[in-house]
Swiss-Prot record:
This is Protein PTOV1 homolog. It comes from the Eukaryota. One of its GO terms (cellular component) is mediator complex. Residues 187-207 are annotated as: Disordered. InterPro entries: Med25_PTOV (IPR021394), Med25_PTOV_sf (IPR038196). GO terms for biological process: positive regulation of transcription by RNA polymerase II. Pfam families: Med25 (PF11232). It comes from Drosophila melanogaster (Fruit fly). Belongs to the Mediator complex subunit 25 family. PTOV1 subfamily.
Length: 364
């Protein structure tokens, strides 16, 4: 397989959707796995063989080929696995592509997909792949043409929350494959070092390659508290930071003029967000929060890496009502999304919180 050149590391709406989905894979797709395999649906090994990939390199540098023995597990419903792998090859060749390229395809394909989990006991070799995927890459497995195999492509993403490689097989195979090829061909036309592009008469520049600019939206402090246990006092935190927004065609689509200088935030388990936020992420504005590395930055990053997300709530005088924040390790930055449908998002968030509070009271 030909390597795909890595694009410039800008932050766009599509990539933001993918990063958020990556962070919430466990909540959206893995949370229903029962602790006791004898209860409810279980996972069954449906394929065993070799997973092969090359180092993600730029330009014409030598590449190293890696191979790891692994197995693929799928959910079993009514005694039958969701995926039929009878005609799959014994070796799956994986192409590493930048998440930004994959994000342009559209996260609707990941939502309307079947899921599998890759497992391997060869930790040292597998860590090489995990490291690459934690650095801004995803895997794409192309299946050879076979009339007896109805699978054309599988997308592989690493879920840090559950320390697992999760594969997605889009249900709309034809549309996904066509869109993937369009994006890959567009990426190959973009060199690692950008130079002015001259539109060709027979091939005008694709719409998806419009420039994305990160514009400063707000500067202030983020305030939250943590508590190690109920017996210990809470600790207040304050992080000086700036919020940038990804804009196209010079229009940010949102104003922060009425945002307070001190932004209050509460931490909550990201699984709460994962129960309902997928539908809102697609219709949201993406922001990126940057701060100087330090004790407070590391404290918040540690909390979010351990399974928390941030919810910044504003007063009734502010047009924007809520911002959700997640931590992106590859960028060492906090990504946020502002739902366009603020009222319904806040309503659904309250419902989910009330449900969990009621469950907690019932256990007492």
């Amino acid at each position: 397989m030909e390597p795909v050149p890595e694009e410039a590391r800008g932050v766009g709406d599509d990539e933001g959707e993918l990063d958020c989905l990556t962070h919430m894979i466990g909540a959206l797709l893995l949370q229903k796995e029962p602790e006791n395999p004898e209860n409810g649906d279980s996972k069954e090994t449906i394929w065993s063989g070799e997973l092969e990939w090359e180092d993600a390199q730029i330009l014409d540098q030598p590449k190293t080929l890696h191979t790891v023995q692994c197995k693929i597990c799928s959910m079993v419903k009514e005694g039958q696995p969701e995926i039929n792998t009878e005609n799959w090859p014994n070796k799956l060749k994986t192409q590493l592509i930048p998440k930004k390229v994959l994000g342009k395809i559209g996260e609707q394909f990941l939502k309307d997909a079947r899921m599998v989990v890759f497992r391997s006991s060869q930790g040292e070799v597998l860590n090489l792949l995990i490291t690459a995927m934690s650095s801004g890459f995803a895997g794409c497995i192309h299946f050879p043409s076979n009339p007896n195999c109805n699978i054309k492509a599988l997308i592989l993403i690493y879920s840090r929350d559950h320390q697992a490689l999760v594969g997605f097989i889009p249900n709309n195979e034809d549309s996904f494959s066509e869109r993937l090829q369009e994006i890959l061909q567009g990426a190959k036309r973009k060199p690692g070092v950008k130079t002015p592009k001259q539109p060709q008469p027979e091939e005008p520049p694709p719409v998806e390659e419009d420039a994305i600019i990160n514009e400063l939206l707000w500067t202030g402090s983020l305030n939250w508290s943590t508590q190690a246990s109920l017996e210990e006092p809470s600790i207040s935190h304050k992080l000086e930071c700036s919020v940038y927004i990804a804009i196209k065609n010079g229009d940010p689509g949102i104003s922060a003029e009425d945002w307070p200088t001190d932004m209050p935030m509460v931490l909550m388990p990201s699984i709460y967000l994962g129960q309902f936020a997928g539908a809102f992420i697609k219709d949201s504005k993406l922001i990126i929060l940057r701060s100087t590395p330090g004790e407070e930055h590391d404290s918040l990053a540690s909390s979010m890496s351990a399974g928390s997300c941030g919810c910044a709530r504003f007063s009734s005088e502010v047009v924007c009502k809520v911002i959700m924040l997640l931590y992106s390790s590859p960028r060492n930055a906090f990504l946020g999304f502002i739902p366009r449908d603020q009222a319904n998002f806040v309503k659904r968030l309250r419902e989910v919180l009330d449900e969990h509070r009621q469950k907690a009271r019932n256990k007492e």
